[in-house]
Amino acid sequence: MLWFKNLMVYRLSREISLRAEEMEKQLASMAFTPCGSQDMAKMGWVPPMGSHSDALTHVANGQIVICARKEEKILPSPVIKQALEAKIAKLEAEQARKLKKTEKDSLKDEVLHSLLPRAFSRFSQTMMWLDTVNGLIMVDCASAKKAEDTLALLRKSLGSLPVVPLSMENPIELTLTEWVRSGSAAQGFQLLDEAELKSLLEDGGVIRAKKQDLTSEEITNHIEAGKVVTKLALDWQQRIQFVMCDDGSLKRLKFCDELRDQNEDIDREDFAQRFDADFILMTGELAALIQNLIEGLGGEAQR
């Protein structure tokens, strides 16, 4: 089981049908296919269990996990520039004249098409977890752009996907700032030794504290001077550590060894059973963490 490393959390803004049987067919229509000779990038669905299953969905306890795969052709700008300059120089020498800008632009497309078939590919995979019980969708990535790209693929596959980023009633950065100022987080959470503080003024600067006592006078002085906490490392019930960000995302998830070893009695050779058990364990813990976090941050924004 690929334990999630980050969480971008989204709320379904209205109820839609998310049944695995239907989704299996819908995702199949957008299954991953490799780039053709003239494709810059391709994205599609692959089995979350990899070579161990052909299914594009894996379901347990109302939780669904799916996996998007992306192939991108790598064409460094200097390579394109060098090939283009050589092509321009050759044509200008042959025709004994300087090429116009429109001609150079047209040549750039030609050069791009000639280089694409020989370009290397970069592959990446993004896991997505659909919590049909709580109406949430979680994407395992650190950037909003990557999450939005994956959601866009799912929206295209399903025909409709009404989601909004999970947001709180109170600004998250103000709640995090109060936790650091008071030296105490919400029930179930403990402050760790890492935070990022930003000034409310545009040119006020950023402070990144690592391996530091966040209740120290130095940190308090930054808060008194008008800085707010935009990232804060937290521990949840000594089970999961993570960095809470002011955009509502959870970064650098770290599950405690005791939690990760809970299914060690299952033979690792039985990949399907271990994957299923780890998925149930992980989603159960994260669902509880998210609910606890929503309460601790003052409740979800009313829609």
Swiss-Prot record:
Pfam families xrefs: RdgC
Cellular location(s): Cytoplasm, Nucleoid
Recorded GO CC terms: bacterial nucleoid; cytoplasm
Key words of the record: Cytoplasm, DNA recombination
GO molecular function: double-stranded DNA binding
Coiled coil feature spans: none
Swiss-Prot/TrEMBL GO biological process terms: DNA recombination; regulation of DNA recombination
Role played: May be involved in recombination.
Family note: Belongs to the RdgC family.
Name listed for the protein in its UniProt record: Recombination-associated protein RdgC
Organism annotation: Shigella flexneri
The gene coding this protein: rdgC
